[in-house]
Amino acid sequence: MNDAPGIALSLPGIAVIGGGPAGLMAAETIRAAGIEVDVFDAMGSVGRKFLIAGKGGLNVTHSEARPAFDTRYRERAREVGAWLDEFDADALREWARGFGIETYVGSAGRVFPMDRKAAPLLRGWVRRLRESGVRFHLRHRWLGWDGDGRLRFDTPAGASCLHAGATILALGGGSWPQLGSDGAWVGAMSEAGIDIAPLRPSNCGFDVGWSAHLAQRFAGAPLKPVIARWHDAEGREHALQGECVLTETGIEGSVIYAISADLRETITRDGSAMLHLDLAPGRDVTRLCEALSMPRGKRSLGEWLRRQAALDAAKAVLVFEVLGSDAGNDIDRLASTIKRLPLRLLRPRPISEAISSAGGVRLGALDDTSMLRAMPGVFCAGEMLDWEAPTGGYLLQACFASGLRAGLGAVAWMQR
């Protein structure tokens, strides 16, 4: 995609800054109302993070029924729920059908396009937007506002300033900065007096501090299945079965991402967080003790754990990491550790490595149309807002829905 020629100093319609799902949905909504719209993006093409999300299969939304669906947004369930009232999972699936793309419900209720790919959907979407009259301006990095309130951009041709009838900011969070969502907008918006919660990693891994042996020999090894147990901010214990992966610095994977918000908040409050892993789901301590009490002869403890407790090498090395070389001397302790292996999580991985981010423009800084109370005519959408959700389609669903909300708000502003 090439830059549209020559940007006027004053746009007749609405400027959408950010070409991710939220920004593109806002642009579509605006154009459907007959209002001119220009989309600006810092990268050489739009939807780059959207394409990466589709690498392992594009999970566009989730089939979970509401209101349970809304609870996935934690303390922002009420506000995000209002967006979903206008564009829920069924609406998203019907929208995709408009491109000839059917969807299906896969494992654990996740919804995918039939071919599981992001590129066909993005290509069709951008084509339709262009045909409707949406103008794209690529490699235009937004820098904030000048003293006259005009939008400032760094462009291939140099600095540029322009005025628009309304502006929608859909600049993303702070994860995957190489794809455009680098969080650089925080400085400009803070200077403008916008209330912003610090950006933090979400759906992320955590550092543990392994021994050199584990870090060097078992990084990348999967742990499956396991049951993770952890405590929330109120001290309630929760359990979730799934899979995770050992890394050179700690642990990550789907079950860790799903509980990362609670773990991150505990670390913020207490300096670290305790995570317990059940390495042998389906077997109780008594049965494990009986199996491990059998004579093991000349077999190594690792081989014995594989035969008697069905622990692979990755799970066994975790047991040795916690109990040390004398792990087999106390069978009761060994069995208890297998069922509740303690890991002290030291810190979340950097936001640049996270799947998504928490924090951003506080929802209280917006009115019900997603317009900034402090800046009439400026709207916000997508991951740059202060909400978070687990993977599984919840992230994209809220981005689409918030883009629609901001688009409708900007249309109403222009038509007032």
Spans of model-derived segments:
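N-terminal Rossmann-like FAD-binding beta1-loop-alpha1 element of flavoenzymes
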Residues: 12-39, 406-411
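Glycine-rich FAD pyrophosphate-binding loop
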Residues: 31-55
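Short beta-strand to alpha-helix junction loop
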Residues: 80-88, 108-127, 176-181, 208-211, ...
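Glycine-rich loop(s) and the adjacent beta-strand/alpha-helix scaffold that form part
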Residues: 166-212
